């Protein structure tokens, strides 16, 4: 009987030791995975960006932003996603459905249709914002993926220099 108790105790301790060893290995793997492939955080268009935004000066600019799309009367995109840089600024990414042709006209068959583009906004309030479309001499006009657009179309890369000051209508 004594031998059976010792064997049972020894078996229990071995199982317990294996449990702790396996548990430690799993925790280490999860920690490494969490820090290695940190995903970009794209969100749906927030409610305070949705609406029609206008500038009325020498010319009228109008931008319409919905949960899924962005248009300025010339180019249009859907699958809209936002990457916030803070509470008042960020980037709106769209997949072109209407883009510029080589002759500066806009159409649904332009080469960039289906590709990704970005617009930067800053100083967002409930009724105003500053908006700039991505442009850089000798820069890209669109990218194949949203991740490429996020890496390419940035303030630091020189794509956003002129901002329109807009009011919500």
Describe every region a protein language model picked out.
Residues 56-62, 75-150:
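Contiguous, well-ordered beta-strand patches that form the walls/edges
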Residues 3, 18-48, 169:
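Bacterial Sec-dependent N-terminal signal peptides
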Residues 2-11:
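Bacterial N-terminal signal peptides that target proteins for export
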Residues 45-61:
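Tryptophan-anchored aromatic micro-motifs
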Residues 62-68:
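Intrinsic low-complexity, repeat-rich intrinsically disordered segments enriched
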Residues 149-159:
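Short, exposed beta-strand-loop hairpins at the edges of beta-sheets
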Residues 160-169:
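Short, low-complexity, Pro/Ser/Thr/Gly-rich segments in the mature regions of secreted, periplasmic
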Residues 10-20:
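Sec-dependent N-terminal signal peptides
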């Amino acid at each position: 009987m004594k031998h059976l108790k010792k064997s049972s105790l020894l078996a229990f301790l071995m199982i317990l030791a294996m449990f702790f060893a396996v548990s430690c290995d799993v925790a280490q793997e999860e920690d490494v995975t969490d820090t290695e492939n940190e995903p970009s955080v794209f969100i749906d268009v927030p409610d305070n960006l949705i609406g029609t935004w206008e500038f009325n000066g020498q010319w009228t600019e109008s931008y319409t932003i919905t949960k899924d799309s962005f248009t300025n009367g010339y180019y249009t995109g859907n699958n809209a996603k936002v990457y916030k840089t803070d509470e008042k600024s960020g980037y709106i990414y769209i997949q072109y459905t209407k883009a510029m042709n080589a002759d500066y006209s806009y159409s649904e068959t332009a080469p960039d249709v289906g590709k990704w583009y970005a617009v930067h906004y800053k100083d967002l309030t409930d009724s105003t914002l500053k908006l700039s479309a991505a442009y850089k001499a000798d820069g890209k006009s669109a990218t194949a993926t949203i991740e490429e657009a996020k890496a390419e179309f940035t303030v630091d890369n020189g794509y956003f220099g002129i901002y329109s000051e807009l009011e919500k209508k």
